Amino acid sequence: KDAAFVTEVESKIEKKLTKINSKKKKASGSFVYEFLLWDDKVFTKKSPTTFKKLTFNKEENISKVMKRVQRSSTKKKKTFKSFSFIAEYENNIPIELFIEQDKDKKDFEKAEQEALLFAIMYGQMPNFLKTYNKKIYVHNDVEFDDGLGTWWVMYQKKEFHINSPKINKKQACAKIGRYSNCAVVMAHELAHVIQQLTGVISPSKWKKAIKLDKKKYCSKYAKKNSREDFAESITCWIAARYKSDKIKKSDLAKFNEFIPNRLKFFDEMNFNMYPL
């Protein structure tokens, strides 16, 4: 009796595991990347940039700005002291950067280095993504993080926020191994800005493209909701059309197989892609 019971239990477990593995296989067959362009060096510090110069503006107190960290879903407002910089780009595109000051030390040189890092990276984005955004906030709510930290866009704001991890109090995004990942996330956040504010994107045409791609996605994260799908898809399109030599041929083939209608949608927008 005991042997029969054990056999029955093992059979049920085996069936359940088979079902779970089947679901996992099916799910992984619906997207190209689990983590978008993670192993690809799509951007480097030497990638073309439209950045011209960085100018210190002033010290400024910032109030009622959202505080976010990787391991907490709590959304609190905060006030902090910052160094404000103005970055200038070709085609008369300016951006204001606010670098949060360290609480224990007012280190202007460190803040300037951070501002320069992200200002140059911003210049590597295609012009159509730079046109509408006006501000970048670089936060200092540091906690242990082995990834890229927390990046976000506030609803109906022409700005985005970076709370990336530090290594020995220096920006992790400055490391060669993480630079491209950070630049990819920057493109993703700027895609949120253009989708929610500009009226450039036709919601009906975008929904049609999604429907035609029949529940296939660029990345696993794109499946979260329509906003993340848009941001991930436009980043994949940039990689597929303008950085194809930086990604695997097999992944490029999957782009064309999984999201051809999304790619076509962006192709037909005739965006200003300079300096890519």
What spans do the regions from the language model cover?
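Active-site recognition of the HExxH zinc-binding catalytic motif
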Residues: 184-199, 231
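Metalloprotease/metallohydrolase-associated module, dominated by Zn2+-dependent proteases
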Residues: 209-276
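N-terminal module-boundary/linker segments of secreted carbohydrate-active enzymes
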Residues: 2-79
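Soluble non-cytosolic domains of exported or imported proteins
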Residues: 108-116, 177-181, 185, 221-225
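Short pre-active-site segment immediately N-terminal to the catalytic Zn-binding motif
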Residues: 164-186
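Solvent-exposed loop/turn segments at secondary-structure junctions
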Residues: 142-145, 167-169, 200-201, 237-238
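Auxiliary, metal-adjacent structural segments of Zn-dependent hydrolase domains
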Residues: 31, 47-49, 58-73, 77-165
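A structural motif
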Residues: 154-156, 195-210
